[in-house]
């Protein structure tokens, strides 16, 4: 493709038709641009308005015409305007220069911090790594967050679905993961805002600055690049911005040989934009009105997110489930690619358990003895069965009271409450508003702590000592402090 694309660099065509974000461009015979080439249209229309937009070639129509999808609004664009074939796909800046900056789908800075100087660029369309380059041995990605590492561990180079409504702590969890990979793994993160609210993107940027993930005084010390194609933008931008963010992440993995965290919020909007574009291009819709190429579109994005022998891209993807229907083709296609799911529960947030990760609903393909080891597996399953038993007993407790339970069940309830409290932990990025210093808990300390609760070693300690602490040593110290305060 590259050879034929290069041959048409600089070829000029003429816009013949504009229908919303879709335009037809006529080129000289034998000089048609390749599929996925970027076309640049700049100039003034007859009314004197400035027009500047990039469009991506999607179809070759015959009669020397191509059909392209605009990456920005087509307001002011008229028939007869000149379109230039760039001879290559859309390219975005990559490397250290992107850290601390916000880009649009075309890789243009939108944060009013000035243009990038002497920056390397990379095309957003490329093949997934070959099988021989992949790291096939499953490796757990330690996050330092107890509930995730113990019950739904992430795979290094894997894909995680993050499910949660408004106000349950999704953003704070994302920030903490970005903070932890920067400090503990020396890695960087890329955030792809796909089709979500502009206000949320702005709030997120400000929160990243407050928490120090983005250093506005010295951008070189930042550990995050952001790429946005929000709700108000045309479907072309929303369909491609995920690839722009992924391209930035791939450079850190392949060239800098780093472990990268890639956030996509929201993966459903990527599918939705593809559906809009498909309809605009006149393709026959598939099930529930989605594009017939749904599986291919999702696969092309997801298969590039992986671990290679050089480094890894671990992806956390927020998944919106339309009408809570998990059988909808969009989430159903996404689920096929996920290695783990992290479910945030409003009931836990209401109890003040943060992070509000549901220990019974969250899952991971990594939680098996052959991957995490027997001790980790046994501990995780024992924690889940204790919490499940507590859940079953709650109706009895509500009706008859705790005293009506057997001795064994009372012990189970007591330990389950301690486990629930111990699954909470203070976050580094929340220090500003909690006043508590954040904790990164090593996996071995997490397993040791839960084993001690399950074995009954800590039955004599008060429940409150387990709330919002890091390791089990802090629980003991907090219990002593509570005891001494009670005596005083």
From Swiss-Prot:
**Which residues does the record give as ATP binding sites?**
164-171
Q: Which PROSITE patterns match?
A: ATPASE_ALPHA_BETA
Q: What class of enzyme is it?
A: translocase
Which reaction does this chain catalyze? ATP + H2O + 4 H(+)(in) = ADP + phosphate + 5 H(+)(out)
GO CC annotations on file: plasma membrane-derived thylakoid membrane; proton-transporting ATP synthase complex
Q: What is its EC number?
A: 7.1.2.2
Keywords associated with the record = ATP synthesis, ATP-binding, CF(1), Hydrogen ion transport, Ion transport, Membrane, Nucleotide-binding, Thylakoid, Translocase, Transport
Give yes or no: UniProt keyword Ion transport: yes
List the membrane topology term(s).
Peripheral membrane protein
Instruction: Kindly list the places in or outside the cell where this protein is found, as annotated in its UniProt entry.
Output: Cellular thylakoid membrane
Q: Which SUPFAM superfamilies match?
A: C-terminal domain of alpha and beta subunits of F1 ATP synthase (SSF47917), N-terminal domain of alpha and beta subunits of F1 ATP synthase (SSF50615), P-loop containing nucleoside triphosphate hydrolases (SSF52540)
Pfam entry (one): ATP-synt_ab
- A GO molecular function held by the record: ATP binding
Xref: SMART domains: AAA
Primary place of residence? membrane
HAMAP family attached to this UniProt entry: ATP_synth_beta_bact
| PANTHER family, per the entry | ATP SYNTHASE, ATP SYNTHASE SUBUNIT BETA, MITOCHONDRIAL
Q: What does this protein do?
A: Produces ATP from ADP in the presence of a proton gradient across the membrane. The catalytic sites are hosted primarily by the beta subunits.
What family does the database annotate? Answer: Belongs to the ATPase alpha/beta chains family.
Assembly, per entry? F-type ATPases have 2 components, CF(1) - the catalytic core - and CF(0) - the membrane proton channel. CF(1) has five subunits: alpha(3), beta(3), gamma(1), delta(1), epsilon(1). CF(0) has four main subunits: a(1), b(1), b'(1) and c(9-12).
* Name of protein: ATP synthase subunit beta
Identify the species of origin: Prochlorococcus marinus (strain NATL2A)
